[in-house]
């Protein structure tokens, strides 16, 4: 979107492009130029006319936007590296969407109402996140990838993007963000995946 702020990913120090790229890849990962498609279930095909996004705390609905209303919120473009728990990394991926900070501001919230959040997606997928990992420009609801509307197989029409954690935390087909007083496991976390998922510490599974 024209006029949107742009944040570029780390470009490395002097010493050669290969060395710079290697420094951006967490241990145990390999770089791919493809964009593998991995999902916990079938790919939902949600029409934008039927799409909405909400913020919730307890039994209270804090804010809700239609697709058109969400498109009108401040948009941010970023270029980041992403890292999947299945050991692939993709460098310099370009995304555009609405940061969680902008969502809170649009909802009239000076601060998040609780320290944790659970994104909820079409297909009943969930994952848990500390709010500290979603603020300060660290996370967004992404609507576009590579300058194009986000394809359904990659989470479109909208997915969460939390690029500093393993990519299962970047929930596809996201529809709601539920704030929580206490941390709760999401879909994969309930099946033994790590509750946090830091790729630089190889936190793939519980106990890592």
Label the predicted regions.
Residues 3-208:
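Structured, non-membrane catalytic/scaffold regions adjacent to prosthetic-group chemistry
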